[in-house]
Amino acid sequence: MIDVNKFESMQIGLASPNKIRSWSYGEVKKPETINYRTLKPEKDGLFDERIFGPTKDWSCACGKYKGVRYRGIVCDRCGVEVTSSKVRRERMGHIELAAPVTHIWYFKGIPSRMGLVLDISPKLLEEVIYFAAYIVIDPGDTDLEPKQLLTEAEYREQKAKYGNRFEAKMGAEAIRELLKKVDLDKEVKDLKKELQTATGQKRTRAIRRLDILDTFKNSGNKPEWMVMDAVPVIPPDLRPMVQLEGGRFATSDLNDLYRRVINRNNRLKRLLDLNAPNIIVQNEKRMLQEAVDALIDNGRRGRPVVGPGNRPLKSLSHMLKGKQGRFRQNLLGKRVDYSGRSVIDVSPKLKFYQCGVPRPMALELFKPFVMHELVKRGIASNIKNAKRKIDSEDDDIWDVLEDVIKERPVLLNRAPTLHRLSIQAFEPVLVPGKSIRLHPLACEAYNADFDGDQMAIHVPLSDEAVAESRLLMLAAHHILAPKDGKPIVTPSQDIVLGNYWLTQAERGREGEGMIFSSPAEATVAYENGDIHYHTIIGMSADAMPKKPWPQGHEHGIFITTYGKLVFNQLFPDDYFYINEPTEENLNNPLDAKYFLGEGQDIHDKIDEVGDDLIATPFKSSFLSDSIATIYKYYKVQRTSEYLDDLKKLGYTSSTTSGITIGMNDVPEIKDKDEKVAKARKQVDIVSKQFRRGLITEQERHDRVISIWNACKDEIQNEIAQIHSPRNPISIMADSGARGNISNFTQLAGMRGLMATPNGGLFEIPVTSNFKEGLSVLELFMSTHGARKGMTDTALKTAQSGYLTRRLVDVAQDVIIRDDDCGTDRGITVSAIMEGDEMIEPLFDRLVGRFTAETVKDPKTGEAIVGRDVMMDENMAHKICDAGVTHVKIRSILTCDTPHGVCRKCYGMNLATGEEVEVGEAVGTVAAQSIGEPGTQLTLRTFHNGGVAGAEDITQGLPRVQELFEARNPKGRATISEVDGVIDSIQENPADHTREITVKGKIDTRSYSVPYTASVAVSEGDYVHRGDKLTLGSVDPKELIQVTDTLTTEKYILAEVQKAYRMQGVDIADKHVEVLTRQMLQKVRVLDPGETDILPGEVMDIGQFRDRNKEVIISGGIPATAQSVILGITKAALETNSFLSAASFQETTRVLTDASIRGKNDPLLGLKENVIIGKIIPAGTGMPVYRNMEPEADVKKPDSVYSIGDIEKQMKEKEQSK
């Protein structure tokens, strides 16, 4: 076999008949498969051992030669070579056809490739190929035209008239002769001449013909190879025949299709030998043509060939296409060994990097390792004995298993795998039972819960795989989410509840005002019952000497609660003491107001700051912030420890607290009935107004809805006031552990208005609450909304999954390729606004990006941050606080790295908080970050609350799809094509339009907009090109024609951010930038100049520059081109890799085109390397790392965590050389 890791690229082309014969190990002459009695393959049949190799390893068919020692001998009796039976997966045969046939892909595809080469319409071509008409091949000296079609009658007439002075034929034979006659050089020359004058349809057709003829000329393929003399027969193990119980056989459809071809071929041969009448031979040739068509692509032309039960047979094309095809089923993803799956449940005792694996499962997964160890320790005498011990679950094996699994991480995966955190590595711990145990903090990343979810487990086998799992994939390292750099391991439920309760303060608890010299002393007091967790106490700062205290208070006494003291012991010794859950306290020493003044009585101080302590228990959002802060200062390992301690303390405290909820915790509302009655009265008044014709139906509906909403809000506000902070339900809601005020309202107040199936609201509200119970009608009304919720979710999941797939496909080859592309371009960013609403603040857009120029203070002119510096949170805060509104940053959109991005333009890797490393697959991460929250977006197109005149604005998932697919948006805005002043806005009542005139310096443009559109400008306003004249969404295709690429990219970026942030989903700009850049990688050539590019050709921006460079160097005229924007589906199909495109969609079309062009796949992306089984060119698969040589006397580096350190050492070594 060839070693895939050795070759650089892969080329596809047309196979010549001789090539097909050279692949073959022999001709298949008979349609037989296997003998029904002996079940052995028939000679010369589709499974012949002489052609395809032996069915048994190292044994010929007749049994004369058995054993490896005869390897390579061809048996003199049966003619079978003695070799491994695996060759039956790779050896091909062929069928010699008695008449040539055309290949349906090249005749039937759109555009028809044969039709273009011969300049004949596909319809006429079909008549010739299927023997309905003759085509003139050589008119000789007659008055016939070359390539003229003649019916049977016309042909006879001309034959009678001219005899043999002309030549006309039918079928694939005729086509082949015509293709042979095509003079590519001459045709190309003529077409180029024609292009100079042609216009319209003629020009388009000429360009298409030129394209394909040029392709044939340059690729080394010959046009006549589109017609076949011999059909390859694929290896028998790829179209197997298996025996079922009961002696029947199941066979691959391909065998049926091959048998039809062979039968018809043999019949044709016989007819030709017998000199049968022409009409019979022609009919047989047509049937042979149809049989080969069905074999290659069944159903492409005419009715598909069906098997038993009228099921269309699966042809060669179908074996490649779709989710079940070769590409997606077997090449991009395979079933793997050493894996298992089971239900998951929670285990709070595990460390963050551990998972529990059931004993029987671990034994099966690590079987070979256990067997090896048993033999090594002498517990078993040989492997067979060891296997027996394991199968009988001997007592000796468990200790060995414990030792074997140490230091060997396993991977856990939960479907759907939406982002890279859905597969993480854990160290296995043996547990009883049959379920896999998961750490509660890992749930968030997996989106797992324990209501029956299942997970798959995989064992990395090679040393490299183990090392990567350990260093890069261990769960303890995945603290930050790649999509926004915020912690993904946020504590939830019990942990939040426990820590909230622990950090509450209460006046008048036992032991209030006691002062302690150390935390240990306080603990003794608690255990003796002298103080409670909620007691406000004094504590000596001397007890924690390493902590930073406010100046002058290093030896003072500060006020805190015992619970907060316990909580603070989770933090590192040298970290601030946290008394208040604020950003300020997380980054600075404790506020001096909590320290006792000299000679001040502690009770006075408690009166002073007690309320501040009572108001500040630690909520869920604060716990998340604290994780981020600890990560910022102390990095991975310490944060991981903090998380485990936080979990432990939370669970312990929520147990100690004894918080439960009962029916009596739901408060009663006294005047609910009065409020409802008042609302009913208002509704009656509105109905009366409607009946009198004072208001419209729409107004009546809107008013009724708003009356009931107001009523519900009133009740909700009352609930918020009456529930006490010590009510268990309030504690749960307030801490962020579970539930919120609206759940509360439904329990104690009223449920309010329900959704109708079509997305509106019922006017009749549900006035009952769950405590009172609903009436039958109310219950029935609530079911509509519930059902709609379920169906929406199901639809949304599919939509979102497909979006993710397209995103991954378009961005999979974006990898960090080098350190710095050296560009001096960048983009200027400012806060994204929608009207007066802040969508994304400037701060979020700066963190983790490199500056493209020095940022100066607008007041003093001093430099705040220099050029080419990666901004961290502190720098970003400084910039924003100084009042800077626009900052120029390095951006992926302006990066000059071919086939990827450089480190400087990308900036920080959000998952680690460090600068991104070379080899990081940022394209895939970007696609996952945008696709994963897709399920949280709405499916609906929102309307502007029924306000007339405002257009419907698409939001949520449909809007994201609309942007990434570059579709014409719903509610499209008219944009200005010139810079200038709004000269006039005139109404035109006759045709219900308004005329907006923009007067520019050079020309004046008028735009006619409908009455219903909201005009966004007024007379005298100055507008730039691309500015909106009416409200709505801009069509990016229009925008790119009026402005430039960068403006369009920035527009898409801002709009995608709006769609996500409106739904409360934060995604970093850089992910959207990666995808936007992929949509604008192509240009359309307007004028080819003196290059050999065709006009109108769409090509890669990099290739275009290279071609122009060559021409300019040789002193010619360069080509000009215009950027085009492609939707992600189109962009994924237009990629330079035919393997990646074929495995995405439209497989046959992609392969047809690629083979004619003789395309060369440079194997730069991830997919194409996965398909051919080569290591992917990302991370340690980058050539830089693959070609490393180990050194003998190397010292162990201090930090073996990051590839970056190793890189640095390599560089230092090179420089010292």
From Swiss-Prot:
Stretches assigned to coiled coil: none
UniProt-listed Pfam families: RNA_pol_Rpb1_1, RNA_pol_Rpb1_2, RNA_pol_Rpb1_3, RNA_pol_Rpb1_4, RNA_pol_Rpb1_5
InterPro entries per the UniProt record, alphabetical: DNA-dir_RpoC_beta_prime, DNA-dir_RpoC_beta_prime_bact, RNA_pol_asu, RNA_pol_N, RNA_pol_Rpb1_1, RNA_pol_Rpb1_3, RNA_pol_Rpb1_3_sf, RNA_pol_Rpb1_4
Cofactor note: Binds 1 Mg(2+) ion per subunit. Binds 2 Zn(2+) ions per subunit.
Any one GO MF annotation of this record: DNA-directed RNA polymerase activity
Binding site for Zn(2+) 2: 821, 895, 902, 905
Record's catalysed reaction(s): RNA(n) + a ribonucleoside 5'-triphosphate = RNA(n+1) + diphosphate
Similarity-based family: Belongs to the RNA polymerase beta' chain family.
NCBIfam families xref list: rpoC_TIGR (TIGR02386)
Subunit structure: The RNAP catalytic core consists of 2 alpha, 1 beta, 1 beta' and 1 omega subunit. When a sigma factor is associated with the core the holoenzyme is formed, which can initiate transcription.
Function: DNA-dependent RNA polymerase catalyzes the transcription of DNA into RNA using the four ribonucleoside triphosphates as substrates.
Alphabetized HAMAP family for the sequence: RNApol_bact_RpoC
Protein name: DNA-directed RNA polymerase subunit beta'
Native source organism of the sequence: Lactobacillus helveticus (strain DPC 4571)
Gene that encodes the chain: rpoC
